């Protein structure tokens, strides 16, 4: 790299092992021709030993330097240490090679001073005294002060941060502290944080201000969050109680299954209890739950008025005429099987053919006369246990008790599944339309226990109790009307 005329290239000792000797300005400002010797690197003043720049005289190069004609002398004086000057170079040394710099800032030194001068400090102090009420210079003011004081922007910001910290320590603070602004540098922020930690009084004042601001800034979103949190907590408590009730219900179902598997006749439908006593007990239950019936019928009126199974039920009653209990006994069995969920067990599928066969037998027996059907259902508990226990299917507990109709709306959010939950209001077709289903003994017992275990589901248990009106009383009413 070649340098322009008038500029003296002065390499430092850290860059070149053998530095170039200093030349006077007359050497550089003298006439130059293309015959000036150059090194292969293209530098006019090459520091390498093999250069022939000044070892021979060139035509037209009038050098005032007193070089001897001996190349060896020129070589030693050119390559030698700059501190060991030869006699031939003594006249050309106008200044020491490592003397004062030519420019404002020396080569290799940092562009700015590390410490501020007195003039710069005085300028910054004057600005600080003028702005004692707000000693936070803006970005533009910092740039202006940096230009005036010949300091960097970071140095100016740090100086003001330190000045504010000193004033705080000396209790000469005449401004209100503010939060860290965006235009302040990181070191200034660190200094401010240290300052707040150093001054305990300011910490107390800041704590009071933060407390007041926290009360004032309590936004509606925080209030909504607290409210939602409370609702979630209540929901968890309800889920806990529901899980407990479901666990107790499963235990009850297991107990009932274990009791029913031992004897052929169900202990829930004791054989020693006469049909007349059962009818009296059912009449009492019907009277107790009559007021529940009125409210539930209004709720179920709209959803079940056009239920297809309900329409089938009514049409069958109209067609059969006087044989009303035959229609009800035949119709109640198939919809109970269709109202199941999709989760059927293998045992249930295997016994489905037996169910159909027994249901046809029961229909044939009940189809003789209404009086004979009453006698058969009362006198043969061993042949058809479901006739006494009033189950929708002909096998005792052929499916899990949890999936029976009164349990599903009571303990889940699902609606009704069949005409068993249909509208039970007065009908002009026949009095037996008010009959619901054959759930008499077992469901009433289990529901009474479930009501004691799950009191929070009071409304649901009332709807379950309404569904437990039994058909013997309704059948008696139908026969009396005949």
Curated annotation (Swiss-Prot):
Chain intervals with Pro residues compositional bias: 264-273
Alphabetical list of InterPro entries matching this protein: HD, Homeobox_CS, Homeodomain-like_sf, Iroquois_homeo, KN_HD
SMART domains linked: HOX, IRO
Matches recorded under Gene3D superfamilies: Homeodomain-like
Transmembrane stretches, start-end: none
Biased composition (Basic residues): 284-305
PROSITE patterns: HOMEOBOX_1, HOMEOBOX_2
Localization terms from the record: Nucleus
Feature: compositional bias, Basic and acidic residues: 199-256, 467-482
GO cellular component, one term: cytoplasm
Molecular function (Gene Ontology), one example: DNA binding
Chain positions covered by the region annotation Disordered: 173-307, 462-482
Protein's UniProt keywords contain Manganese: no
Feature: compositional bias, Acidic residues: 182-198
Keywords from the UniProt entry: Developmental protein, Differentiation, DNA-binding, Homeobox, Neurogenesis, Nucleus, Transcription, Transcription regulation
DNA-binding region: 109-171
Source organism, top-level taxon: Eukaryota
GO biological process: brain development; cell differentiation; dorsal/ventral pattern formation; embryonic cranial skeleton morphogenesis; gonad development; proximal/distal pattern formation
Tissue: Expressed in the neural plate in overlapping patterns with other irx members, which all share an anterior border of expression. Broadly expressed in the tailbud rhombencephalon (hindbrain). Outside the nervous system and at tailbud stages, expressed in the developing otic vesicle and branchial arches.
Family statement: Belongs to the TALE/IRO homeobox family.
Biological role: Acts partially redundantly with other irx members in neural patterning. Required for formation of the posterior forebrain, midbrain, hindbrain, and to a lesser extent, spinal cord. Patterns the neuroectoderm in both the anterior/posterior and dorsal/ventral axes. Does not appear to play a role in pronephros kidney development. Involved in craniofacial and gonadal development. Modulates the migration of progenitor cell populations in branchial arches and gonads by repressing CXCL12.
Protein known as: Iroquois-class homeodomain protein irx-5
Highest classification ranks of the organism: Eukaryota, Metazoa, Chordata, Craniata, Vertebrata
